[in-house]
């Protein structure tokens, strides 16, 4: 295994590709595949997220489908912790527990394996991007429903103009991000 040295001066935002008008006109899609495709950039992202997470002393990393899995699994490995995937309904085999949450037009459901997170576990939630905050708030509600303590939610990218970070703060959920893309 090759351990890449820390790159504290690396501009992670420069490694995120912006695709205009995707998936529809007027949207600036922030594509992390260019960040994770760069070994140094991905390693530095994981190092920074892990350092943030370590300050909260979690028992587990909880990773949100789907790109949160990439960062959550790497962080958990770096920190010597387990990682628990939270998935959309019907994606996990076996007995699951879940929470329904509101979308702009309808509802969705998130699930995890029963017993994967236990009462008293201190967890850090991880996803790649924070937009409106709905998915991470639902994930936090799911964790609390099993008696876990949600220490914080961590993201690679925040789109503050969409209100997610403010919404999380208003809900009392600590939030940290590595990159913020304002406007455009």
Curated annotation (Swiss-Prot):
Question: Out of the domains of life, which is the source?
Answer: Bacteria
Record-annotated disulphide pairs: none
Q: Which reaction does it catalyse?
A: AMP + diphosphate = 5-phospho-alpha-D-ribose 1-diphosphate + adenine
Assigned GO CC terms = cytoplasm
Primary enzyme class: transferase
* Pathway(s) of this molecule: Purine metabolism; AMP biosynthesis via salvage pathway; AMP from adenine: step 1/1
Q: What is its main location?
A: cytoplasm
Tell me which UniProt keywords the record has, alphabetically. Cytoplasm, Glycosyltransferase, Purine salvage, Transferase
UniProt-listed InterPro entries:
Ade_phspho_trans, PRibTrfase_dom, PRTase-like, UPRTase/APRTase
Residues spanning the membrane? none
Q: Name one Pfam family in it.
A: Pribosyltran
Q: Name one GO molecular function term.
A: AMP binding
* E.C. code: 2.4.2.7
What's a GO biological-process term for it?
AMP salvage
Q: Which NCBIfam families match?
A: apt, PRK02304.1-3, PRK02304.1-5
Quaternary state and interactors: Homodimer.
Q: What task does this protein carry out? A: Catalyzes a salvage reaction resulting in the formation of AMP, that is energically less costly than de novo synthesis.
- Name the protein family: Belongs to the purine/pyrimidine phosphoribosyltransferase family.
Could you tell me what this protein is called? Adenine phosphoribosyltransferase
């Amino acid at each position: 295994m090759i351990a890449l040295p820390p790159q504290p001066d690396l501009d992670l935002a420069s490694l995120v590709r912006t695709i205009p008008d995707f998936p529809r006109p007027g949207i600036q899609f922030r594509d992390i595949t260019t960040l994770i495709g760069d070994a140094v950039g991905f390693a530095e992202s994981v190092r920074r997220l892990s350092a943030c997470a370590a300050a909260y002393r979690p028992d587990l990393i909880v990773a949100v489908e789907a790109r949160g899995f990439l960062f959550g699994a790497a962080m958990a490995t770096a920190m010597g912790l387990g990682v628990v995937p939270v998935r959309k309904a019907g994606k996990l085999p076996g007995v699951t527990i879940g929470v329904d949450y509101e979308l702009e037009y309808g509802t969705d459901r998130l699930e995890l394996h029963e017993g994967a997170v236990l009462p008293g576990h201190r967890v850090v939630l991880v996803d790649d991007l924070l937009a409106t905050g709905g998915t991470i708030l639902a994930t936090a509600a799911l964790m609390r429903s099993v008696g876990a303590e949600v220490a914080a939610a961590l993201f690679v990218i925040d789109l503050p103009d969409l209100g997610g970070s403010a919404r999380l703060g208003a809900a009392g959920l600590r939030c940290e991000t590595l990159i913020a893309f304002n406007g455009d």
